[in-house]
Swiss-Prot record:
It comes from Hordeum vulgare. The gene is SODA. This is Superoxide dismutase [Mn], mitochondrial. Destroys superoxide anion radicals which are normally produced within the cells and which are toxic to biological systems. It comes from the Eukaryota. GO terms for cellular component: mitochondrial matrix. Its cofactor is Mn(2+). Homotetramer.
Length: 20
């Protein structure tokens, strides 16, 4: 999992990018 995930935004742990 990414260590820089934001609690307010769902993250795509496969792409390591904010899923927005």
């Amino acid at each position: 999992v990414a260590t820089f995930t934001l609690p307010d935004l769902p993250y795509d742990y496969g792409a390591l990018e904010p899923a927005v």
